[in-house]
Every structure is written in structure tokens, then in C-alpha cells.
Amino acid sequence: AVCIGCNWNITPDALGPKVISKILVTRHLSGTLPVEIEKAVRPVAAVSPGVMGITGIETGEIVKGIVDKLHPSLLIAIDALAARRSNRINAAIQMSDTGVAPGAGVGNRRMLLDEAHLGIPVIAIGVPTVVDAATLVNDTMDCILEEMIRQTEKGTAFYETLADLEQEEKYQMIAEILGPYTGNLFVTPKEVDAVVDRLANIIANSINIALHPGITLEDINKYAW
């Protein structure tokens, strides 16, 4: 089963729904396909449950109900992420087998989608598409501090002070200072709509090829879209 925890009304968060629209769904065709095609594909289901702000239901509750009813052997969860470094935005596709916490990147902690809660293995796929204001300021401060350290004589008290600044402590301090002025501000690149489309194609193609043993990239490009 393939599911997502994204808000399709927000461009940088619409990665999941765009991937779902390109997944080769075959569960409803099981037993009705010709033998040669039946051997080439596996039963796959896909769902885009939305977010709690749209449905009023926890994404995890919807997914748990589906898992309990369908008993899939594997869940692939796709989500847009918040980057902790500005140079990571739209620059990496992250995968893990430890599940995903929908909304955690923007401060909305929801029910975990992991094996402990769902009872089946969960592969999480995510792409950082936004960054918060504190991270942007933190990255700028890092560049300034690196230049100051480079120009400061080693061994001096000022040098040691600069060198001893902890990354997480600095980030938390910046977030607390900016909080009253910017609130929960997140930004995304202006070309995010085109980037999300390309990323959705890459992820969907990869999932289709991985799940269906008889499907190649050439087949997808020829018949899918």
C-alpha cells in the first residue's frame, strides 16, 4: 500500500498527492488480468488521506483503519519535509525504514506512521521542500561565524567563544528571538511547483519499478504519461 500525509492545497506540500496520481494501482485488477500481465505486477493500492486540517481525522487513524482492513505486507509513506539546512531544499530524496511523523517538521506532531503503530513494515520517502525562517537566519549566521573564525587568531578567547557555539543551541536561540516577529514562518523556492512535479515523477517511477517486477522505465514512459 502507498499513502501520503500531505496537503494538496499547498504547492510544496502537494508532493504526495502528485506521486499517488502516478502510481500504477493494481489491487482491484487481481485475478482479472491475463497470466503474462498478472506475473508482471503485484497488487498495489494507493490513498491520499489528506491532513487533519482538511478531514478532521488524524492521518494515522485513516491509515491504521486501511491497514487493519486490507492487511498489506508493506506501507510506503510519502511526505514533504522541512529542511534543517537551506541548501537541502529540493536537493535530496530521503528514505528510511523507521516510519514518518506527519506534520512534525512544521510543529504539528501527529500519530506516527511506523511499524510499532501499524503492525507492518513502513518505508518512508520524503523530500525537504520548505525551510523555516530560523533555519535561514541560522545558515546566514554560520557563514558569518565561519568567516569571523577564519579571520580570528587561534587561541584567543574570542576564537574559542566562536568555535564553541553549539549548532542546536544557536538554532534554538534564533528561533526564540524570531518567534514574536515571524511566527511559524516557512518559505519555499519560487520554482517549487515545477520542482515538485519533477520529484513526483522520479519517486513514482521508482516505486512503480520497485513494486512491479515486470515493469520497466521504458514501459512507464511509453504507456503511463
Regions found by a protein language model. Give the residues of each.
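Predominant activation on well-ordered alpha-helical scaffold segments within soluble catalytic domains
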Residues: 16-24, 60, 64, 200-208
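Glycine-rich phosphate/diphosphate-binding loop of Rossmann-like nucleotide-binding domains
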Residues: 6-46
